Structure formats: C-alpha cells, structure tokens
Amino acid sequence: MLDRLHLCVITDATLVPGRDHVAIAQAALSAGADMIQLRDKTSDLRTLLAQARAVQALCRSSGAVFIVNDRLDLALASDADGVHVGQDDLPVEAARRLLGPGRILGVSTHERNQAEEAQARGADYIGFGPMFRTGTKDTGYTPRGLNMLREIRAAVSLPILAIGGITLENVVEVIAAGATAPAVISAIVAAPDVAAATAAFRERVALAKNLGQSGQVPRWDP
C-alpha cells in the first residue's frame, strides 16, 4: 500500500484563514490525494480530536491513508491509520510499542544514518527533507537536494516521502531521484484552489512514475 502512494497532503490550518483541516482534506481527497497527514501544533486537543475524526471518516470513504503528525494520543483517539514522529518526538521504539503492530509509523529523517536507524527500529516509511528551501517548516537542516535523496534511496528499502519546498516544477525530478511520493504543504494548502493544485500534483507524479517504469529519465521543463 505505502509503496504505491502518489501524494501525501499535509494539512496546515494556519496558512489560509477559514480553511481548516477538514476542508483541506476534503478538497485534496476529491482530487486524488491518497494520504492525508494532519499537522497542528497549536489547537486544543478537543478541537483537534473532532477534526481528526472527521478527516479519518473522509479518508476511509476515499480509501486514503490518514496519519497524525507527532500526536500519538490523537492518532489513537481518532482511530487514525498511523502516526508520524520527528527526530525530537517520541523515540521510534516507544512509538511502535504504544501504536501496536497494526498501525503505520512514519519517521522524519534528514541524514542517511537517521534513515537507516528508522528502518532498523521498525518504521513503515520515512519522510526525508527538506528537499529544497521552504518557509513552512524550519527543521534546522539545510536543503538536502536530489543527490542526497538518491543516497537515501540506495540505503533503505522503506517507502520515502520527500518533503520541503516541493513544487510542480521540481516534483518530477524528486520522484526520479527515488522518492515514493511527495509530501506537500504550502504548494497545495495555500493554493487558491486546493483540489486543482492536488490534481496537478497527482498528474505530475503519475507522469514521473510512468516515465520511470518505461526506462526514461523523467524531467519537467516548465
């Protein structure tokens, strides 16, 4: 399932006033997103739980994967498909133990050793980045770039979600460099039309995957 992903949309309710997690997820799912990750560092748990349950219902009806960023308690309470943890969050082994074997565990990585450790400790997929410059999330790391993504792809067998500064102009080369799928925040969530932006990304990723299977080197020339 995870190795067939095309597009993860990470919800951020702070980017556009009045556009909450549910509205973002509904629009993205209608246009082909096959993973939604709910990311919220500020809202109270009661509000988040109501929105997470609504997003999970939307994902289930669409056959998409629902992941909660950081908050294991919220993931379990909302019956999410899994949780995504960062390098400074709950350790991978502890997250896996609490999450159980039947749910998905994703781990943010920025270096080869982190990716290898995440795989060894039981992650189901890794996030890798930031690929390029981004103003959405400050990881403390400089952009990793395509060459490091190729290195990570050669080092681990897990699905890789590439994140950070990914746009329609560079997503094809990101897939060609070894990413399973992009994880996109601002290029979709802050777009004038979330569904249209999602559809454009989905089409571009499908193009990259098809070209890769045919042995061609996918490049996008805008």
Residue map of PLM features:
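A short, mixed-charge helix-start or loop-turn motif at secondary-structure junctions
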Residues: 37-41, 134, 183
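Conserved N-terminal beta1-alpha1 strand-loop-helix module at the mouth
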Residues: 1-89, 97-125, 141-144, 151-158, ...
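Glycine/threonine-rich flexible loop motifs
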Residues: 137-138
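Glycine-rich beta-strand-to-loop/alpha-helix junction loops that act as flexible
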Residues: 128, 161-166, 182-186
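A short, flexible beta-alpha/helix-coil linker loop
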Residues: 13, 132-134
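Short, small-residue-rich loop/turn micro-motifs
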Residues: 130, 178
